[in-house]
């Protein structure tokens, strides 16, 4: 499948060539970065859309303080963390369910709100966890191909809803393309979904949306009582290793999902990390902006060399077309691959991004394109959305 973005309609796909925050960045060896060295060459693993930065010093301090009490059990069922999140998003605590990452919460949703022999509708490609977890829950996956511009085909997904449909999932921004469904289209789609069918709105990358693209979650929930908004602390917050995710929605739906809440399943380190992260919203927003700028730098360089890339609103880029995975692999870069040979790569790590440029554009062309881009100012970018609207990073 070759994906074209609307802004690229006139351009053919051509692949040419074969503590302070600053001091921390100098010290850190990227989470994405050097996984191993083979024959002296650096190798990069960009498969998981990881945040390149470690937790902030204040977050590390909070986690270490919580670890001092690791001999004690956490809460039998989580109460503090749902309250923290509810206060942040403007909901009530009984409207929030937490779990082992967005993946764990999504599985809880499938197991409680759907059932064996029913169907789950989502786009294809999408977050890999959906078809895997659907199978675990005994659901049949109904995968709807993206449209010609590389976006989720919401109307195709609406047509795919039938008598056996028990659950629908929509990503915004979409994983893996990074495209964003227009607010009007999403609302029209949600309006058309029967009220007895729950809809997961996957906002794993919501913190990377611009203010114009962000939606008011409480307004959505007021209009669509069958909606569950799914989020994670793995991406913008850089806490993937702690496995903290949550969903919020109508309390009746959340009450059903909470039935599978694992006792003692949310460690105190997770609660401490979230509280400290909320307190460090300004610093975290700076990191989101830095990743966003780095993403646009890389996208600009690759597009100038003729590679057509959809505009992304995540901490990753989608590289459409056959041979992308293999080309990157030859340069020691592991990318998330798709059946047609397209690839998704994490962004934000400067060394890794430069390696991608060299692999896809060639060293000489990279120097020319980066100089031209810098001179023209195309690396400027839109700041992330007002955190009150886009996600969780607010002061």
Cite the ranges covered by each PLM segment.
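N-terminal "arm"/small-domain region of PLP-dependent enzymes with the aminotransferase-like
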Residues: 2-73, 84-87, 379
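Conserved N-terminal alpha-helix of the aminotransferase class I/II PLP-enzyme fold
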Residues: 65-100, 294-297
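Conserved beta-loop-alpha segment that forms the PLP phosphate-binding cup at the N-terminus of a helix
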Residues: 79, 93-120, 245
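PLP-dependent aminotransferase-like
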Residues: 112-170
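Active-site pre-lysine segment of PLP-dependent enzymes
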Residues: 135, 152-163, 176-199, 203-239, ...
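PLP-dependent aminotransferase class I/II
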Residues: 226-303, 307-310
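Conserved PLP-binding catalytic core of the aspartate aminotransferase-like
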Residues: 291-292, 296-331, 347, 377-379, ...
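PLP-dependent enzyme catalytic core of the Aspartate aminotransferase-like
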Residues: 336-395
């Amino acid at each position: 499948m070759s994906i074209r973005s609307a802004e690229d309609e006139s351009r053919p796909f051509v692949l040419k060539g074969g503590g302070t925050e600053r001091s921390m960045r100098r010290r850190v060896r990227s989470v994405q970065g050097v996984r191993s060295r083979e024959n002296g060459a650096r190798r990069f693993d960009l498969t998981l859309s990881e945040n390149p930065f470690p937790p902030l010093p204040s977050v590390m301090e909070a986690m270490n303080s919580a670890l001092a009490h690791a001999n004690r059990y956490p809460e039998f069922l989580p109460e503090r963390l749902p309250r923290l999140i509810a206060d942040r998003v403007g909901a009530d605590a009984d409207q929030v369910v937490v779990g082992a990452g967005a993946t764990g919460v999504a599985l809880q949703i499938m197991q409680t709100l759907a059932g064996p022999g029913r169907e789950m509708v989502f786009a294809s490609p999408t977050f890999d966890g959906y078809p895997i977890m659907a199978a675990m829950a005994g659901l049949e996956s109904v995968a709807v191909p993206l449209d010609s511009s590389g976006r989720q085909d919401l109307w195709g997904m609406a047509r795919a809803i039938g008598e056996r449909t028990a659950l629908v999932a929509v990503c915004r921004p979409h994983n893996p393309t990074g495209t964003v469904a227009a607010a009007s289209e999403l609302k029209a789609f949600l309006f058309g979904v029967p009220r007895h069918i729950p809809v997961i709105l996957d906002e794993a990358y919501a913190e990377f949306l611009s203010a114009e693209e962000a939606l008011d979650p409480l307004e959505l929930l007021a209009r669509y009582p069958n909606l569950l908004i799914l989020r994670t602390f793995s991406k913008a917050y850089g806490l993937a290793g702690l496995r903290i995710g949550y969903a919020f929605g109508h309390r009746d739906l959340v009450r059903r999902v909470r039935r599978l809440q694992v006792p003692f399943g949310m460690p105190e380190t997770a609660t401490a990390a979230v509280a400290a992260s909320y307190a460090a919203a300004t610093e975290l927003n700076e990191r989101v902006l830095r990743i966003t700028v780095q993403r646009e730098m890389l996208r600009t360089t690759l597009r100038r060399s003729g590679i057509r890339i959809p505009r992304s609103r995540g901490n990753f880029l989608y590289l459409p077309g056959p041979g992308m995975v293999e080309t990157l692999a030859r340069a020691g870069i592991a990318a998330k691959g798709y059946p047609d040979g397209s690839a998704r790569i994490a962004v934000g790590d400067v060394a890794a991004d430069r390696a991608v440029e060299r692999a896809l554009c060639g060293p000489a062309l990279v120097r020319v394109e980066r100089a031209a881009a810098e001179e023209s100012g195309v690396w400027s970018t839109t700041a992330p959305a007002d955190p009150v609207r886009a996600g969780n990073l607010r002061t």
